[in-house]
């Protein structure tokens, strides 16, 4: 039976992290990813005579498994596994598996490498059918590990990885797709790191295209080569060297080679960029700086950008991550920026949230370059996407809704207030070619201004009510239902009591109509997609499946006011990532029969796909209510016992002399009291104590009986559940999973979103009503009243 993907990756990381010991994560990643590489090519290509990757005899992952627990395991991995594969495929810079400083020596090394190999023996890590089934185990596992390695590597060593969310945005807005690409289409990254950006662009093409990358770090370049093979791009060309001083991709005439698409996340503000660069030569007609200007000596941002411009074909397009400073810094950079804009090469600028990238917290932007129709370009499309993100540990991450919104708005060139607009070249020229986004897009939230007149004389300013116009558009008569004109112009008065605001809003006919409309939209989406969900089978591609569902949900909520379609979309995608994704992959792997399976942990069990609660709700609600009643009775008895014990504890209490209060000690005490009463039958205190002790014992007996009934009833319900799971039909499983689990959860999040929207209106009206409810005159009168009372009290006290 397949393991859930989330469980697989989490356990994979936990095992790796445990084995790392004192080694830096940026180093340990090299060993883990080489192991992943060997496992992948062995599963994928071993025994295939015409495979794109050559695996010499005796160098497969199974040959590595045979080396476990052998004294020379490190040397043998180098000589028998890594060395032959590297030589056969012209790979270099592979990590040393016999390095004593990193892996220990003697028995310590043997244990560490044996355990590392064992991690990848997990049968669920089988890459034989990877991608062909639409289940990219390798790609997802790789992303998971790389993100964790980058997080653990710290500020100076995490730059080998561009966050997947940013890579996805770049790939989707650069302009490549399955229709406009062929095997000859080329994509290039001059600072490719581990190659994640290149791979995301290649994925958008949905076919094998020509991939090229250059990386200055030796080890990272080797990692990028492996990454290309791991992601089914074995023909990709990755070269090692300094892109600025020694660009290795050149045409037959020796000039900089050009490409259809370029993506890059170069090192920010690289100070020593000019080392080895022949600046006078680069200023010549064939040089990279010709017609633009020379970047400043201690800042390489524009050096990389101009290299990218030079690397673009006549109709080439690029997406580059650079720090915000490139948009507004002066002197040499201002000259270059002006020339780029005048030539029409800059197509768009997107401001990103701060702290997205590993290795730096500097705010960054995406610069979109496009040589196609550059001479006729009239403006630059600008976007401030800096506020859309979620916290993820000590970093920020783009959410699914942020990615989708950025891509939608940019590709369709939609102008959204406080978010995006097309800025004419004329306006940019008027602002001296300064591209600082706040100069063109004011994304600041409107200030909540306090109205002095309202504080002095009461009532609510009409300006505050007009700020809620998006609500009044949907509920046109609600405003007059809640407010009436004040005696003063420009002010209104609340017609109802503050405590009745929520009830009046939620029961208003227009609110009810809108709620019904939202429900109808969701119901239409549900009716359309329930059958699609129930049709999941072995040939289903989970990523295409969720794309269909999520796109349809976005489309469904596109024409509704108040509710943000991207918020609704995010709810679906969050549920997909937390639960639905695992369910879908299980169904693709094992079929709907996985709904019959249960998992045991100690003495408790749970459905592998269908939680017990869903089965109970649909089939055993009567039994569950009976159990809940018994549990309530048991809890009530426990509360009575606790209350009785608390009442009679303490030194003077009837239980005060007991070390512990339980059935045995109370029984013994009752015998003593009964004996004492034989000698003093009318002792009121003894009689009362006997009564309390007997009450305690009676409640204890009742509690024991209640516990027995709860245990017995729960066991009976568990037995029915255990019998029900294997007897569920496929149709019943589909109903439970799709309707009761997935659709019901998504529907609930949509309803909660509707509640939040309405609650914001309620809270705002309450806030305004409370703010101006008491005038300054009334406040001063109240202050004077209490001041006089205090004075009188002080006078009585002689002060």
Regions found by a protein language model. Give the residues of each.
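Conserved Class I SAM-dependent methyltransferase catalytic core
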Residues: 11-14, 18, 24-37, 238, ...
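Hydrophobic alpha-helical scaffolding
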Residues: 106, 131, 213-217, 261, ...
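Conserved S-adenosyl-L-methionine
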Residues: 156-264, 268-280, 286-291, 302-303, ...
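Non-catalytic, mostly N-terminal accessory regions of nucleic-acid modification and defense proteins
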Residues: 1-178, 239, 243-248, 351-354, ...
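Catalytic core segments in nucleotide and nucleic-acid processing enzymes
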Residues: 283, 295-298, 725
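Hydrophobic alpha-helix feature that most strongly marks membrane-spanning transmembrane helices
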Residues: 229, 233, 267, 310-313, ...
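Conserved P-loop NTPase
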Residues: 366-407
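Conserved, well-folded catalytic cores of nucleic-acid-processing
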Residues: 18, 123, 144, 148, ...
């Amino acid at each position: 039976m397949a393991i859930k993907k989330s469980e697989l990756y989490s356990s994979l990381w936990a095992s790796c992290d445990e084995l790392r010991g004192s080694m830096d994560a940026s180093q340990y990643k090299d060993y883990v990813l080489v192991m992943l590489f060997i496992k992948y090519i062995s599963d994928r290509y071993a025994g295939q005579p015409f495979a794109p990757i050559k695996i010499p005899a005796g160098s497969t992952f199974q040959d590595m498994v045979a080396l476990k627990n052998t004294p020379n395991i490190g040397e043998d991995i180098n000589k028998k596994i890594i060395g032959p594969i590297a030589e056969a495929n012209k790979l270099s810079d592979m990590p040393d598996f016999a390095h004593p400083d990193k892996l220990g020596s003697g028995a310590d090394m043997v244990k560490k490498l044996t355990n590392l190999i064992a991690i990848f023996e997990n049968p669920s890590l089988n890459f034989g059918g990877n991608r062909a089934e639409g289940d990219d185990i390798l790609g997802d596992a790789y992303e998971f590990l790389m993100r964790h390695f980058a997080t653990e590597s710290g500020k100076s060593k995490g730059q080998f990885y561009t966050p997947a969310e940013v890579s996805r945005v770049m790939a989707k807005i650069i302009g490549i797709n399955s229709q406009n690409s062929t095997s000859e289409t080329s994509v290039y990254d001059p600072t490719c790191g581990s190659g994640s950006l290149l791979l995301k662009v290649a994925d958008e093409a949905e076919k094998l295209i020509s991939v090229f990358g250059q990386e200055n770090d030796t080890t990272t370049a080797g990692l990028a080569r492996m990454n290309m093979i791991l992601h089914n791009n074995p023909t990709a060309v990755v070269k090692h060297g300094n892109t600025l001083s020694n660009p290795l991709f050149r045409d037959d005439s020796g000039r900089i080679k050009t490409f259809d698409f370029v993506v890059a996340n170069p090192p920010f503000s690289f100070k020593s960029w000019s080392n080895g660069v022949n600046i006078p030569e680069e200023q010549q007609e064939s040089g990279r700086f010709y017609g633009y200007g020379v970047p400043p000596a201690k800042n390489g941002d524009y050096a990389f950008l101009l290299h990218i411009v030079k690397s673009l074909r006549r109709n080439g397009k690029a997406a580059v991550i650079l720090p915000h400073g490139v948009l507004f810094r002066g002197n040499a950079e201002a000259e270059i920026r002006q020339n780029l804009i005048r030539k029409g090469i800059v197509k768009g600028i997107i401001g990103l949230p701060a702290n997205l990238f590993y290795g730096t917290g500097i705010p960054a932007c995406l610069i979109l370059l496009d040589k196609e129709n550059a001479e006729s370009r009239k403006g630059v499309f600008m976007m401030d996407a800096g506020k859309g993100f979620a916290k993820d540990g000590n970093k920020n991450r783009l959410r699914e809704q942020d990615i989708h919104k950025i891509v939608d708005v940019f590709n369709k060139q939609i102008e959204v207030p406080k978010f995006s607009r097309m800025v004419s070249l004329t306006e940019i020229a008027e602002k001296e070619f300064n591209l600082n986004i706040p100069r063109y897009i004011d994304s600041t939230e409107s200030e909540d201004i306090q109205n002095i007149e309202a504080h002095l004389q009461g009532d609510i300013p009409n300006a505050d009510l007009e700020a809620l116009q998006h609500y009044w558009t949907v509920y046109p008569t609600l405003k007059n239902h809640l407010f009436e004109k004040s005696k003063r112009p420009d002010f209104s008065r609340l017609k109802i009591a503050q405590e009745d605001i929520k009830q009046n809003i939620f029961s208003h006919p227009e609110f009810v109509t809108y709620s019904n409309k939202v429900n109808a939209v969701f119901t239409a989406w549900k009716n359309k997609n329930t059958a699609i969900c129930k049709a999941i089978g072995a040939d289903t591609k989970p990523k295409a499946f969720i794309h269909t569902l999520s796109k349809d949900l976005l489309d469904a909520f596109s024409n509704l006011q108040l509710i943000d379609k991207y918020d609704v979309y995010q709810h679906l995608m969050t549920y997909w990532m937390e639960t639905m994704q695992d369910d879908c992959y299980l169904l693709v792997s094992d079929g709907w029969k996985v709904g019959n399976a249960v998992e045991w942990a100690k003495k408790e069990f749970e459905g592998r796909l269908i939680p017990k609660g869903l089965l109970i709700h649909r089939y055993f609600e009567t039994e569950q209510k009976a159990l809940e009643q018994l549990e309530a009775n048991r809890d009530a008895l426990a509360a009575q016992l606790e209350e009785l014990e608390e009442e009679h504890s303490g030194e003077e209490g009837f239980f005060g002399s007991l070390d512990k209060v339980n059935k045995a000690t109370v029984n013994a005490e009752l015998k003593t009291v009964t004996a004492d009463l034989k000698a003093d039958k009318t002792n009121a205190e003894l009689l009362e104590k006997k009564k309390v002790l007997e009450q305690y014992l009676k409640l204890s007996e009742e509690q024991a009986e209640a516990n027995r009934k709860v245990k017995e009833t729960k066991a009976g319900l568990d037995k029915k559940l255990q019998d029900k799971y294997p007897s569920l039909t496929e149709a019943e499983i589909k109903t439970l999973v799709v309707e009761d689990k997935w659709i019901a959860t998504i529907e609930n999040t949509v309803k909660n979103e509707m509640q939040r929207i309405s609650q914001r209106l309620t809270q705002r009206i309450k806030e305004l009503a409370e703010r101006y409810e008491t005038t300054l005159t009334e406040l001063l009168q109240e202050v004077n009243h209490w001041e006089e009372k205090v004075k009188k009290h002080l006078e009585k006290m002689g002060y």
